[in-house]
């Protein structure tokens, strides 16, 4: 269990607050973005590398408070991590039977020890309290009342699906699921969805890792749409600037008298030379043309 405690934020060494070497945070370049195991911490001097989750759930490791650090960076000192590694060498994992098991159940009556990955394989329940900075581990039997398991009981649910497939009913089950999704989809589009519909979709998307790839693709769509609208705004800004410049030029022409706004458009549309020839025609020609009509 990693739990925050008040720490020294003063970098200047004195009798009460010596300089402590901290683990440095890095992100795995090969893990999917946002993956829960992608955050790692390491110490170049001590040649130690550890997953962030393994540090957080280690029972004997305490994270120090550091007001000067961003919320996304954990504050583990190298000395405490080395001490926890030494403690783990004496503890055997109840699942894989190998040493290095620094995670234990929060209740003293549960004496099992695990590696974090082994605890998840054994269907342990992880409890996180971000407000108090606590990370606890419970077995299925002693989980707090109302606690929603973060790791589902795959040992029960996987055989159920296999039995459905053996009975030829897996397609029927999936069709019912799709019908439910289509129903909720229609309600969302028609704005008639209930609060339970919204909660069901949110739980489906964020309550498990099944749709992790879908959410990552959706994030790409959001970024693409944002770039598209930014480009539209840029083009609209250019057009507005061009229109404003054109309007200013027209006003300048009017002020300088380059535009004769008083001229009427109801006058003769004939070219000047044709208009002059028509005016010089004799009255006889004009009268003859009138008689021919």
From Swiss-Prot:
Q: Which GO terms describe its cellular component?
A: nucleus
- Highest taxon of source: Eukaryota
Zn finger intervals (PHD-type): 91-143
PROSITE patterns in the cross-refs: EPHD
Reply yes or no: does the keyword Hydrolase apply. Answer: no
Please state where this protein is localized.
Answer: Nucleus
UniProt-recorded Gene Ontology molecular function terms:
zinc ion binding
Instruction: Mark the C2HC pre-PHD-type zinc finger spans by residue number.
Output: 25-61
Name the record gives this protein: PHD finger protein 11A
**What organism, scientifically named, is this protein from?**
Mus musculus (Mouse)
């Amino acid at each position: 269990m990693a739990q925050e405690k008040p720490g020294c934020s003063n970098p200047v060494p004195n009798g009460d607050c010596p300089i402590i070497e901290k683990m440095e945070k890095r992100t795995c370049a090969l893990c999917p973005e946002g993956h829960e195991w992608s955050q790692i911490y390491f110490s170049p001097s001590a040649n130690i590398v550890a997953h962030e989750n393994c540090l957080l759930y280690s029972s004997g490791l305490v994270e120090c408070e550091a007001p000067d650090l961003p919320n996304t960076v954990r504050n583990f000192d190298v000395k405490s991590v080395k001490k926890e590694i030494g403690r783990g060498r004496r503890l055997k994992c109840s699942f894989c039977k190998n040493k290095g098991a620094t995670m234990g159940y929060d209740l003293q009556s549960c004496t099992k020890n695990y590696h974090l990955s082994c605890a998840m394989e054994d269907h342990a329940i992880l409890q996180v309290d971000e407000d108090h900075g606590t990370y606890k581990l419970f077995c299925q039997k002693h989980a707090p009342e109302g606690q929603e398991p973060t790791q589902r009981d795959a040992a029960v649910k996987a055989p159920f699906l296999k039995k459905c497939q053996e009975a030829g009913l897996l397609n029927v089950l999936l069709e019912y699921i799709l019908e439910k999704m289509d129903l909720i989809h229609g309600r969302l589009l028609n704005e008639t969805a209930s609060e339970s519909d919204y909660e069901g979709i949110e739980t489906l998307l964020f309550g498990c890792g099944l749709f992790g790839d879908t959410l990552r693709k959706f994030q790409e769509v959001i970024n693409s749409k944002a770039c598209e609208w930014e480009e539209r705004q840029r083009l609209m800004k250019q057009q507005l600037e061009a229109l404003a410049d054109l309007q200013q030029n027209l006003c300048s022409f009017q002020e300088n008298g380059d535009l004769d706004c008083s001229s009427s458009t109801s006058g003769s549309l004939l070219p000047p030379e044709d208009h002059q020839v028509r005016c010089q025609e004799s009255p006889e020609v004009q009268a003859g043309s009138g008689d021919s009509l």
